[in-house]
């Protein structure tokens, strides 16, 4: 039977698949819309499975809070273009809502949880891979709780390229908590305070700094003093409370929070794609890859 343009349009709207894929599916199923949808889903899922070896190093972070619970998550895509797609943004929001409401312990538990639409989180993501046409991955998330007497600070940089969720104790000042989150996004400290730095790491740095000072030919009687000074600078680079506050470098972060009788309880910072090695291919390698097939 002849397939009409209206049928193709309807199938595209229902599945998000390409025009030629829709026309082919309708032809193969003699114009049966439901069977065509099933066929495209089968092909879409197969297509999604074939994409599993791709590196998804773009994407976005998102933060949502509801009362005393908050969630920060990172979802990866293969291209920045898809990360700006409305369908991708809808997926990001839907996943955030689910994680916030259900608070799974880890990724494995999250992927197996049933959503309101009846599918598992994994099935929901896979169905969106078929529609969007790229590998999509829920990479990580953290669900954080606070007390009524504490404050959440949520900050997204560059539309979600970096996300930080902070918790301050001793204050309900959300503006201050957001300022701290903004600082963490900009400076990326590894620890809140010096007491979180292991003795092993501190001693290792001290040994390196000592050797540096001796190599510079400094007298041994002043090496120890120099090393402690440089070690303080090391702590300033990696510890949030010791850092100059980005909005007012004349003050340390610890002074800013202490002025409000507050303390930094915790923070989570996600930067899209950090730690993921993006595959770099040039034309010569592409030709070689084709030759080897």
Curated annotation (Swiss-Prot):
Keywords: Cytoplasm, Elongation factor, Protein biosynthesis. The keyword Cytoplasm applies. Residues 79-82 are annotated as: Involved in Mg(2+) ion dislocation from EF-Tu. It comes from the Bacteria. It comes from Bacillus velezensis (strain DSM 23117 / BGSC 10A6 / LMG 26770 / FZB42). Associates with the EF-Tu.GDP complex and induces the exchange of GDP to GTP. It remains bound to the aminoacyl-tRNA.EF-Tu.GTP complex up to the GTP hydrolysis stage on the ribosome. The lineage of its organism: Bacteria, Bacillati, Bacillota, Bacilli, Bacillales. This is Elongation factor Ts. The gene is tsf. InterPro entries: EF-Ts_dimer_sf, Transl_elong_EFTs/EF1B, Transl_elong_EFTs/EF1B_dimer, Transl_elong_Ts_CS, UBA-like_sf.
């Amino acid at each position: 039977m002849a397939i009409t343009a209206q049928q193709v349009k309807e199938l595209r709207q229902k599945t998000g698949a390409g025009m030629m894929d829709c026309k082919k599916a309708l032809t193969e199923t003699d114009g049966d819309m439901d069977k065509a949808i099933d066929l495209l889903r089968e092909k879409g899922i197969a297509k999604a499975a074939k994409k599993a070896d791709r590196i998804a190093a773009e994407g976005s972070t998102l933060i949502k809070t509801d009362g005393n619970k908050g969630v920060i998550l990172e979802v990866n895509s293969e291209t920045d273009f898809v990360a700006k797609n409305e369908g991708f943004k809808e997926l990001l929001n839907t996943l955030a809502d689910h994680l916030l409401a259900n608070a799974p312990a880890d990724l494995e538990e999250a992927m197996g949880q049933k959503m309101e639409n009846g599918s598992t989180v994994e099935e929901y993501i896979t169905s969106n891979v078929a529609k969007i046409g790229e590998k999509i991955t829920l990479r990580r998330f953290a669900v954080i709780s606070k007390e009524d007497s504490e404050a959440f600070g949520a900050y997204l940089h560059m539309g979600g390229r970096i996300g930080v969720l902070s918790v301050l104790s001793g204050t309900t000042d959300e503006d201050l908590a957001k300022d701290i989150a903004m600082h963490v996004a900009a400076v990326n400290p590894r620890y809140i305070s010096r007491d979180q730095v292991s003795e092993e790491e501190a001693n290792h740095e001290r040994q390196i700094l000592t050797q540096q000072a001796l190599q510079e030919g400094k007298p041994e009687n002043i090496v120890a003093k120099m090393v402690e000074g440089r070690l303080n600078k090391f702590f300033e680079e990696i510890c949030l409370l010791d850092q100059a506050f980005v909005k007012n470098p004349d003050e340390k972060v610890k002074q800013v929070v202490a002025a409000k009788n507050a303390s930094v309880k915790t923070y989570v910072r996600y930067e899209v794609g950090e730690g993921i090695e993006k595959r770099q291919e040039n034309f010569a390698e592409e030709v070689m890859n084709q030759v080897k097939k």
